[in-house]
């Protein structure tokens, strides 16, 4: 322990003697450690951290593979009847439970509020072993027996605190959920947010209340509708693999049962074969399940790798500084060795300096990381739920930073410590620092470190170029919509107010008429499904006169739109007509008799070739059923999900023929600045019915930016990392060349005394810069080629081994190297030969 304190005192004295060195080293390390800490803060919360429940390692997620032969409402979804089969008959699980996330409108005395809701099975809390903070939570006996018979609500702890100010008398209070009276029965325990590490529901309701929560979409008994997500807790003795194996026989029994249903009995042999090839998947859910994780985890791992490269550049830079500093301290070290200090003791002192530098860098890096993490979070889109990801570092992040700091201190400190204590005592005590024998060895070490920095910087610059070009390509891919910066979109959910079917339609048409009559509005329309949100709903089609080939993709994306949709969106109608008042269906029979559709050009070309599709008929399903939908128009192609997904075949149907209309997405093309219209549009909806909330108001351009948030996150940080690495490499290169010029002052003076022109001296130094640059690039280019293949899935419109990106990275490094090398080269060429020959 005394030796430790001695090393610390020695290091602190050394730092005080050279504050500039200390500041530069700490800042370099802070940038590297801070970058890693910022990315790790999100990665840990989103990907690595276990759920805060008892024995999370025993939780699994269950879902069947495709094809479903029906409606699929999201990834890893299961039908509710299949969930019930698993819950009653699966032997590998203590309990099987399910949930589904959506949004509802809650009515209070002073207005309405749009909140996130999680529908859960009655055994949800029991299976997760989560209790109440106050009141009670759901139970199978009290909340999972009667269809539409459990109008109960459990508040999340966060929502209880933020909305009800932790009022304990809230239990027993009645609230309106989608205009339906329900009772608050409890508040879930603090610290429990749910199964999604990124978002938390505000309230939870029993899944038997689905007809209230999603009016018009009552499919609790529908096997062809996959919507809830199913989880389970393993029995002791079962693993994920053994549970998966034990569930396969039961799953195939369920498939045999489903195949007998009337809706599936007409399957062709091809589809029947695919149907029975389905498997049931069982995977660990110890960290929960998150769509946000699915979307951003790959990006975060890529960024973590790039942050690691930044840390290596920082370490190389600081190691180079330490080696240069060791040369100036060789006489001091030689004296200490001469009077009896052991080499191990001196190495311990020098390593302590490195560790203290890295710990100081980690402390500053933690401060920088919180600021950087907030910047990262600002790039993530709002989803309407309560965001759980935090920028503030917690104990896990703190431990990570300390571990990185210690590893970093040893990484960049060991080689300089070995180099500094390997001293020729006689030469060191006799000569001045500038003429020490160790200078040549030190220069070689520093040159190697600079070459490593060049190679690493090249990797980061190539990554920055690839990701920046990907974002540019995606943003400049034509959406098919005209002037999206002038197109305002917002969502209204009249169905949540439990309007009758005709009233929902008339409400939206009333709003549409008022919006169109507003000054500053050029055109307006609404649709059932939003565009450029990164998701959509596709369905198997049957087409008149087209015999599908085995394995042919017969899917098309569908949407229900109002009249005037094409004008509002700026999409051309290539043939036929728009929808109008004739295209409605107040009853299912009327809707089928008058069913019409407009298809996009891609659909028309695929199924009809050069023939006109106008007047032809299409239908839903695989092999049977009527072709009752008449095509009345063809629209130009436009994107549905987003640029990365490309153009799909699309079928548009009249919104007035939606079987169960609920929410609608409005699109308003404005002549004025869009932001000026926001309050006006909200007021218009409120004038029609103030109890119906408006949310998600933004321009379509902003929506596209949110859809590209993953690409923007990677590109932004890649550019920052690339620039940072280049600056650090430039500083390292400048330091090495300044060191070399100082060490070769006598040689340069002798050359000039013998008649060498200044240009020759200038070239002498710049040539060495080019050698360092060339060797670094020679190492970096093949590494960049290999590593870029691992991020190919994140690229768009640019090849992983894109030549022009590599050329641009080389040009940037060459320019930076020339500038960094020119200053010491110019100083060398300006040396006075007489002064140089006297230099020691």
Residue ranges of predicted features:
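Alpha-helical transmembrane segments of integral membrane proteins
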Residues: 1-22, 288-292, 321-348, 352, ...
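Membrane-helix entry/capping segments
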Residues: 1-24, 53, 69, 75, ...
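Short, strongly hydrophobic transmembrane alpha-helices
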Residues: 18-46, 50, 314-315, 358-362, ...
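Alpha-helical transmembrane segments
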Residues: 31-60, 64-65, 372-382, 456-485, ...
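Small-residue-rich transmembrane alpha-helices
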Residues: 39-42, 319, 355-428, 466-470, ...
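Membrane-proximal juxtamembrane linkers immediately C-terminal to transmembrane helices
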Residues: 39-65, 90-92, 131, 197-199, ...
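Mid-to-C-terminal secondary-structure elements
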Residues: 103, 117-141, 150-298, 374-378, ...
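Interfacial "coupling" helices/loops that link adjacent transmembrane helices in transporter permeases
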Residues: 314-358, 436-437, 732-770, 777, ...
């Amino acid at each position: 322990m005394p030796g430790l304190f001695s090393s610390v005192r020695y290091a602190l004295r050394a730092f005080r003697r050279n504050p500039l060195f200390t500041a530069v080293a700490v800042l370099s390390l802070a940038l590297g450690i801070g970058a890693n800490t910022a990315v790790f803060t999100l990665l840990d919360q989103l990907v690595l951290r276990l759920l805060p429940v008892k024995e999370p390692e025993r939780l699994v997620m269950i879902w069947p593979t495709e094809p479903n032969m029906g409606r699929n409402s999201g990834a890893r979804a299961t039908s509710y009847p299949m969930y019930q089969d698993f819950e009653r008959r699966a032997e590998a699980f203590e309990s099987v439970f399910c949930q589904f996330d959506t949004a509802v409108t809650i009515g209070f005395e002073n207005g309405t509020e749009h909140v996130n809701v999680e529908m859960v099975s009655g055994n949800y809390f029991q299976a997760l072993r989560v209790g109440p903070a106050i009141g009670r939570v759901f139970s199978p006996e009290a909340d999972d027996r009667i269809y539409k018979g459990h109008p109960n609500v459990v508040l999340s702890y966060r929502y209880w605190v933020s909305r009800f100010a932790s009022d304990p008398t809230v239990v027993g209070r009645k609230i309106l959920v989608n205009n339906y009276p329900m009772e608050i029965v409890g508040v879930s325990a603090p610290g429990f947010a749910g199964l999604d590490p990124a978002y938390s529901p505000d309230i939870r309701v029993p899944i038997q209340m689905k007809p209230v929560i999603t009016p018009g979409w009552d499919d609790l008994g529908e096997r062809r509708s996959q919507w809830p997500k199913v989880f389970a807790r393993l029995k002791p003795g079962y693993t994920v693999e053994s549970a998966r194996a034990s569930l396969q026989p039961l799953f195939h029994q369920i498939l045999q049962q489903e195949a007998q249903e009337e809706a599936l009995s007409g399957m062709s042999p091809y589809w029947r074969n695919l149907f029975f090839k389905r498997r049931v998947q069982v995977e660990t859910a110890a960290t929960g399940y998150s769509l946000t994780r699915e979307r951003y985890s790959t990006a975060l791992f890529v960024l973590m790798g790039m942050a690691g490269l930044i840390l290596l550049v920082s370490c190389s830079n600081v190691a180079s500084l330490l080696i240069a500093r060791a040369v100036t301290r060789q006489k001091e070290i030689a004296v200490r060795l001469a009077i009896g200090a052991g080499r191990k003791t001196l190495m311990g002192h020098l390593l302590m300096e490195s560790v203290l530098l890295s710990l100081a860098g980690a402390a500053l890096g933690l401060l920088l990381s919180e600021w950087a993490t907030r910047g990262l979070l600002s790039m993530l889109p709002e989803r309407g739920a309560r965001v759980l990801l935090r920028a503030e570092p917690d104990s896990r992040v703190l431990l990570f930073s300390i571990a990185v700091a210690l590893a970093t201190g040893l990484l960049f400190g060991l080689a300089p410590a070995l180099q500094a204590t390997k001293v020729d005592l006689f030469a060191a005590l006799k000569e001045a620092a500038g003429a020490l024998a160790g200078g040549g060895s030190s220069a070689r070490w520093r040159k190697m470190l600079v070459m490593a920095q060049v190679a690493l910087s090249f990797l980061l610059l190539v990554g920055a170029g690839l990701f920046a070009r990907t974002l540019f390509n995606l943003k400049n891919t034509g959406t098919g919509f005209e002037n999206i910066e002038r197109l305002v979109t917002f969502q209204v959910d009249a169905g949540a107010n439990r309007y009758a079917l005709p009233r929902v339609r008339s409400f939206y048409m009333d709003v549409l008429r008022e919006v169109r009559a507003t000054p500053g509005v050029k055109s307006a329309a609404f649709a059932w499904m939003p565009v450029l949100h990164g998701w959509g709903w596709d369905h198997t089609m049957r087409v008149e006169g087209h015999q599908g080939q085995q394995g042919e993709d017969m899917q098309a994306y569908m949407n229900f739109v109002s009249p005037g949709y094409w004008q509002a969106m700026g999409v051309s109608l290539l043939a036929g007509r728009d929808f109008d008042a004739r295209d409605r269906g107040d009853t299912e029979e009327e809707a089928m008799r008058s069913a019409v559709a407009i298809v996009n050009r891609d659909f028309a070309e695929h199924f009809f070739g050069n023939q006109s599709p106008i007047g032809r008929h299409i239908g839903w399903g695989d092999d049977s059923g009527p072709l009752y939908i008449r095509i009345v128009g063809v629209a130009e192609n436009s994107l549905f999900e987003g640029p990365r997904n490309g153009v799909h075949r699309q079928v548009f149907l009249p919104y007035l023929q939606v079987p169960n209309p609920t929410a609608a997405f409005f699109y308003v093309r404005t002549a004025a600045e869009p932001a000026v219209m926001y309050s006006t549009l909200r007021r218009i909806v409120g004038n029609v019915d103030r109890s119906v909330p408006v949310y998600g108001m933004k321009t379509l351009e902003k929506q596209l930016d949110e859809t590209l948030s993953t690409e923007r996150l990677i590109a932004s940080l890649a550019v920052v990392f690339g620039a940072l690495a280049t600056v650090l490499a430039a500083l390292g290169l400048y330091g090495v060349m300044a060191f070399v010029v100082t060490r070769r002052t006598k040689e340069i003076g002798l050359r000039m005394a013998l008649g060498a022109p200044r240009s020759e001296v200038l070239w002498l130094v710049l040539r060495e810069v080019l050698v360092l640059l060339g060797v670094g690039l020679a190492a970096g280019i093949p590494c960049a080629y290999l590593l870029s293949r691992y991020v190919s899935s994140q690229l768009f419109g640019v090849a992983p081994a894109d030549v022009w990106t590599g050329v641009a990275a080389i040009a940037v490094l060459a320019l930076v190297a020339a500038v960094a090398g020119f200053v010491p080269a110019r100083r060398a060429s300006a040396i006075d030969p007489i002064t140089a020959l006297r230099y020691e």
